[in-house]
Design a protein with these regions (language model features):
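Structural preference for beta-strand elements that scaffold enzyme active sites
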Residues: 20-24, 50-53, 86-88, 139-142, ...
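Mobile, glycine- and charge-enriched loop segments
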Residues: 4-31, 226-269
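A structural signal for short coil/turn segments at secondary-structure junctions
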Residues: 47, 84, 134, 138, ...
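Aromatic/acidic polysaccharide-binding cleft in carbohydrate-active enzymes
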Residues: 248-301
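Active-site cleft segment of glycoside hydrolase catalytic domains centered on the general acid/base Glu
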Residues: 34-38, 64, 70, 74, ...
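Anion (oxyanion) recognition and catalysis
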Residues: 81, 174, 281
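N-terminal substrate-binding region of glycoside hydrolase catalytic domains
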Residues: 2-129, 135, 142, 148
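Active-site-proximal loop/turn and secondary-structure-junction residues that shape catalytic pockets
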Residues: 29-31, 58, 93-95, 147-149, ...
Length: 301
């Protein structure tokens, strides 16, 4: 086989020059203040990507019962929109005001507010207030992050339990903004049984999109997996579309992340990005998001 020969360069275009694109990037972990987004906004806009995934940070927003401090999230969303980027919001995580266990975990990661009526009602109020506030600015809202992993559902993943959470959260999303779209899943474990249990609760009828996280070294694995997701969703709601919500590696061998054991370099990272984004688009996902805009210093979700 002859090796490919470079014949030229693709000129980069700013996001403001692009009306729409199926390529996105992650701004995850700002709910825990783990990096300064001011250093990233302009650089990301120059990439020409469109969709930017952010996490809503309930614990950072509601520190006093019933009082929402939106300023930090306002700044992020407004800065993205000002640069012609499209934020979509992952609704997470828990809040120690209502779930005591959430106070023992950094960022309340993995502590869903589902055990008591007080927790459920507080979550409903928060979600409805958030979607109402960002109506006209944010279209897509995702229900939690990687609920099929024990790190994000600490008392033990349960597809049926998550399905009920999806239905309740979808109702809150649409109470705040009837035009909003609901993204559910954010699945990472390739367990179709879990996904079926979730959909069997009736959650599929409340969803517009299924999101998945494709941390697979070989991008060729994606085709069968995405087709399986589509086929399963079609049993419950043929209108569900698919989003690739996270995939990616760091640029160095001592980093953190799902595929941290690779001997990564910036060149290898770039090759991984190109292969995986192309594979996602080949499967006609609605859009594909790369994790993330920077190398993370730790592996918290």
């Amino acid at each position: 086989m002859e090796r490919l020969k470079k014949v030229g360069d693709v000129k980069a275009r700013n996001s403001s020059e692009i009306k729409s694109s199926p390529i996105g990037l992650g701004f995850e972990k700002l709910d825990r203040g783990l990096f300064d987004p001011e250093k990233a906004y302009d650089k990301v806009a120059k990439l020409g990507v469109k969709w930017i995934r952010i996490q809503s940070g309930w614990a950072r927003t509601e520190k006093v019962p019933g009082v929402y401090e939106w300023e930090w999230l306002d700044s992020i969303i407004d800065n993205l929109i000002r640069r012609s980027l499209k934020p979509w919001v992952c609704l997470c995580y828990g809040n120690a005001l209502y779930t005591p266990a959430a106070g023992e975990v950094f960022g309340a990661v993995g502590c869903p507010p589902i055990a008591t009526e007080t927790e459920r009602n507080a979550w409903h109020r928060y979600v409805a207030a958030l979607t109402r506030r960002y109506a006209g600015r944010v279209e897509l809202f995702e229900v939690w992050n990687e609920p099929d992993g024990v790190w994000c559902w600490k008392h033990g993943p349960d597809g049926g339990e998550y399905g009920e959470f999806v239905k309740a959260t979808a109702a809150a999303i649409r109470e705040g903004n009837p035009a909003a779209k609901v993204v559910a899943g954010a699945v990472c474990m390739r367990d179709l049984g879990y996904l079926n249990d979730m959909l069997a609760t009736g959650a599929g009828k409340a969803m517009d999109y299924l999101s998945y996280h494709g941390y697979w070294p070989d991008e060729l694995e994606k085709a069968d997996r995405v087709r399986a997701y589509r086929a399963l969703c079609a049993r419950y709601n043929p209108a569900i579309r698919v989003i690739q919500g996270e995939t990616g590696v760091q640029s160095r061998s001592d980093g953190a992340g799902a595929l941290r054991e690779g001997a990564w370099t910036p060149r290898k990272q770039a090759k991984f990005l190109a292969r995986h984004i192309i594979a996602d688009l080949f499967e006609e996902v609605s859009f594909a998001s790369y994790f993330s805009c920077m190398d993370m210093i730790e592996a918290l979700n």
